[in-house]
UniProtKB/Swiss-Prot annotation:
Protein name, UniProt field: Rho GTPase-activating protein 28
Site feature Arginine finger, where: R421
Keyword vocabulary terms for this entry: GTPase activation, Phosphoprotein
Organism: Homo sapiens
UniProt note on tissues of expression: Expressed in testis. Expressed at moderate level in kidney and ovary, and weakly expressed in spleen and skeletal muscle.
Annotated region (Disordered), positions in chain: 20-42, 55-105, 176-236, 612-631
Residue numbers of Phosphoserine PTMs: S72
Organism domain of life: Eukaryota
Coiled-coil positions: none
Length: 729
């Protein structure tokens, strides 16, 4: 291949499209592979890009690293990775000294569990404060989620007792379990799931009915209802700091907010025959209605999980068809900030329970935190950049400078060969960096003089120099362990889906914008020679990094997994940022429980100790109390089954609409468009607006145009309905 003069631009790598011969088994060893590479591994920068956080079980070659037909990561494919590492070293801007590798600080397990409890919104279990949010969160947990919380709280209390000899609330005060300590749900899943039902039954958990009680049920509750029967499963808490709504086995959460009555767990779970298939079918159905951890736990019990080999070719990644329920699908940006905070907490609990089912524990090591800059562009936290940008544009979700990088590459670089393998002109990149730091926030930087090659280089540097990695590197070892067990790509997707939902808002929005942008680059692969695999390999050291020490083999293993995670994100970008409906259901229950707890009535305290399961089976109307309560319609003169929709920005600002089983959100929008079709400006306005569900058991919810409104109305009859513009990034 002839390389033409490119104005000082160095082509750092070129991907060969010829199929590489699979090397022998010895080539799996990272040091051997590194030795064969022309670049000395000693030249890798001191600021290592992948974290050293492997468990002992992860120190052998992963099952996904090779298939019978082709190596998933052969030496030719990894050239992009090693050359990117070398390019990172060579492009140290302005002669800046790389910080030395951070030492991993050993911490006791109790401290890690305390941090985890804080991260999932259960800091009240540590502080002892009486807050409704923590109580409401506990009231919504599924069986597997509660087992995950129970295990970590038990570890925390045991560690604190040994360390400080202080009185700490017993785990039984929260979960109402028997005198025996909680079983290890994070051990080997084979051992966990073997044995009799009595030996292996998961701990019982707290639960709310999912609806607000009426006055009658409040007044009829007595303290005697909360008494523990010697042979029963309920225990009166010895501490009132955490409200126990009920201690019963919980069925999988469905999107309609109620479990299948009288059905065993395994019958309530959707068909999982896909787990037995080694060869991915052309397309598979994907449901967001059932808790992933519950689903995989039942699959493991029935030995349904089979290994699935991961190959290099893009087409082997399964195509998923998402099952759209009558509630439609919800993007992460369609919910209010407060509700998304609850989604993050629930997602981390669910992710932990998901890995627990496989005997994998999310472990963290404490490293020295890097404080970001408070001005400029590079090395500044995303939240700081957004705070400054929102002074110019209050609705912005992705930093403006990042959007500018995208635009610059899209203008003329989408068809440029090797666009993200080019190192660019070092002198120009250094100059533009300094000017961006000094002039961008004042809107004085001249973007027209920047070439797309320099924009691509600085885009990578932007993410690489963030104070903390865009994606949490502590998840990679757990993902490696999951891959070693070789589950189907669907299981990998579920783990990744929860990881994305657990990201902070700024990271999640930036990651979504980045994956959307890279898919535009991949769409021009025939001209730019940047395939799905090329992008994932080049970006792995830029998106997953840490300044911790690590070995060569660990670096290669983690790099392979990071590249695979990016590959999955790119492949499933359109559905990864959809919020699982079972999590939205739990948020609704949390909000209902919070409203209930805020009443601060003695009768409410009694209700919290009532046997919910008996009440639901004995009185079917209880599950629909919220819908039938007179107070639910007291504040409005609108008849049952009729909603009043408000459109404050349109000429016709309000309309009463009779709902039926076929009324969709887009039908209501069409009706308003017809009523406001007097001028072209009104038509344009309605086309850019969406129907929102506001209040009741949700903060704010931008509804899917295909959502059936009568179904939404039935689970949230106290909501207000507003047509307004959808928030953009």
């Amino acid at each position: 291949m002839e390389v033409e003069d490119s104005g000082g631009v160095v082509l750092t790598a070129y991907h060969s499209y010829a199929r590489a011969q699979p090397p022998n088994a010895e080539s799996r060893c990272a040091p051997r592979a590194a030795a064969s590479h022309p670049l000395s591994r000693k030249s890798i920068p001191r600021c290592r890009r992948i974290n050293r956080m492997l468990s002992n079980e992860s120190l052998h070659p992963p099952a996904f690293s090779r298939s019978n037909s082709e190596a998933s990561v052969d030496s030719a494919s990894m050239e992009d990775f090693w050359r990117e590492i070398e390019s990172i070293k060579d492009s140290s801007m302005g002669g800046q000294e790389e910080p030395p590798p951070a030492e991993v600080t050993p911490v006791d397990e109790g401290e890690l569990e305390a941090e985890w409890l804080q991260d999932v919104g259960l800091s009240t279990l540590i502080s002892g404060d009486e807050e409704e949010d923590g109580k409401a969160l506990l009231s919504t947990l599924t069986r597997t989620q509660a087992a995950a919380v129970q295990k970590r709280y038990h570890t925390y209390t045991q560690t604190m007792r040994k360390k400080d000899k202080q009185s700490i609330r017993d785990v039984r005060d929260i979960f109402g379990v028997s005198e025996s300590p909680p079983r290890d749900t994070c051990g080997n899943h084979t051992n966990q799931l073997d044995g009799t039902k009595e030996e292996r039954e998961l701990p019982r958990v707290i639960k709310t009915s999912g609806s607000m009680p009426d006055d009658a049920s409040l007044n009829s509750t007595t303290l005697s209802d909360a008494s523990q029967d010697k042979e029963g499963s309920f225990a009166v808490p010895r501490s009132d700091s955490v409200a126990i709504l009920e201690t019963i086995p919980v069925l999988p959460v469905h999107s309609n907010g109620s479990p299948e009555p009288g059905q065993p767990v395994q019958n309530a779970i959707s068909d999982d025959d896909f787990l037995e298939k080694n060869i991915p079918p052309e397309a598979e159905e994907l449901s967001f209605e059932v808790s992933y951890s519950e689903m995989v736990t039942e699959a493991l019990k029935r030995n349904k999980l089979k290994k699935s080999e991961i190959k290099k070719e893009d087409y082997v990644l399964t195509k998923f068809n998402v099952q759209k329920t009558r509630f439609g699908l919800t993007e992460a940006g369609d919910l209010s900030a407060e509700d998304m905070k609850k989604i993050r907490h629930l997602s981390l609990i669910e992710l932990t329970a998901f890995f627990d089912a496989f005997g994998i524990q999310l472990k963290r090591n404490k490293t020295e935190k890097v404080k970001g800059r408070d001005n400029g562009i590079f090395g500044v936290p995303l939240t700081v950049l957004l705070d400054g940008d929102r002074k110019k544009d209050p609705g912005v979700k992705v930093p403006l400078v990042l959007q500018k990088f995208f635009e610059k590459v899209e203008e003329s670089g989408l068809e440029s060969e090797g666009i993200f393998r080019l190192s660019g002109c070092t002198a120009k990149v250094k100059q533009y960096r300094e000017e961006l730091d000094a002039k961008f926030n004042a809107d004085k930087f001249k973007w027209d003089k920047m070439c797309h090659r320099e924009a691509a280089v600085m885009l990578k540097a932007f993410f690489r120099e963030l104070p903390t990695s865009l994606f949490p590197v502590e998840y990679i070892p757990a993902f490696i362990s999951l891959m070693e067990r070789g589950p189907h790509v669907k299981v990998q997707f579920q783990a990744l889906h929860l990881m994305v939902m657990a990201l902070p808002d700024a990271n999640r929005d930036a990651a979504q914008a980045l994956m959307t942008f890279f898919n535009k680059v991949i769409a021009n692969e025939s001209k730019n020679r940047m395939s799905l695999w090329n992008i994932s390999t080049v970006m792995a050291p830029n998106l997953f990094f840490s300044r911790s020490k690590h070995s060569d083999y660990e670096e290669l293993l983690l790099a392979n997994t990071a590249a695979h995670i990016i590959r999955l994100m790119l492949k499933y970008q359109k559905i990864l940022w959809k919020v699982p409906s079972f999590l939205i259901t739990q948020v609704r229950r949390m909000n209902e429980a919070t409203m209930l707890l805020k009443k601060q009535l003695p009768s409410v305290r009694k209700l919290l100790r009532r046997k919910t399961l008996e009440r639901e089976t004995a009185s079917p109307k209880t599950s629909k109390v919220l819908q039938k309560s007179p107070s639910a319609r007291r504040m409005s003169d609108v008849p049952e089954g009729v909603i009043r929709v408000h459109a404050p920005l349109l000429s016709k600002v309000s309309m009463a609409i009779q709902l039926n089983n076929q009324t969709k959100a887009k039908d209501i929008l069409a009706k308003f468009q017809y009523e406001n079709s007097h001028g072209s400006s009104e038509c344009i306005k309605i086309q850019n607006q969406r129907l929102y569900e506001i209040g009741g058991n949700i903060g704010e919810h931008c509804l899917d145009p295909d959502a059936y409104i009568l179904d939404v109305y039935r689970i949230n009859p106290q909501a207000e309905w507003v047509i307004k513009p959808q928030q953009s990034s």
